[in-house]
Amino acid sequence: MSRSSKKGAFVDAHLLKKVIEMNKQAKKKPIKTWSRRSTIFPEFVGNTFSVHNGKTFINVYVTDDMVGHKLGEFSPTRNFKQHTANR
C-alpha cells in the first residue's frame, strides 16, 4: 500500500538540514545516515550518503534517476551466497 498523496514524501529533518548546509558550503564529503526510510529529494542530487545497512555504511552517490526512491533501496541488507554446483 502506498503513502497517501496528501501527506507528501518523507525525509528526516536532520538529514534535510545537513544536505542544505552541505549545498551552501559546496562541500562533497559523505553524509553519514541511518535513515534508510528517507525519500531522495532533488536537493540531494550530487551528494554522497553513507547509508547504514545494519552492519556497515555503504556509500551511495545520488543521481537524477534516484529522485523519488528511498535511500535504503541502494544499500542492500542481505548478501546472496551462490549455490554450489552439484558434485
From Swiss-Prot:
Family matches, as InterPro entries: Ribosomal_uS19, Ribosomal_uS19_bac-type, Ribosomal_uS19_CS, Ribosomal_uS19_SF
Signal peptide: none
GO cellular component, one term: small ribosomal subunit
Top-level taxon in the UniProt lineage: Bacteria
Stored PROSITE patterns: RIBOSOMAL_S19
Keyword entries, A-Z: Ribonucleoprotein, Ribosomal protein, RNA-binding, rRNA-binding
GO molecular function, one term: rRNA binding
Single GO BP term: ribosomal small subunit assembly
Classification via Pfam families: Ribosomal_S19 (PF00203)
General function of this protein: Protein S19 forms a complex with S13 that binds strongly to the 16S ribosomal RNA.
PANTHER family found in the cross-reference section: RIBOSOMAL PROTEIN S19P FAMILY MEMBER, SMALL RIBOSOMAL SUBUNIT PROTEIN US19M
Family: Belongs to the universal ribosomal protein uS19 family.
Protein name stated in the entry: Small ribosomal subunit protein uS19
Gene behind this protein: rpsS
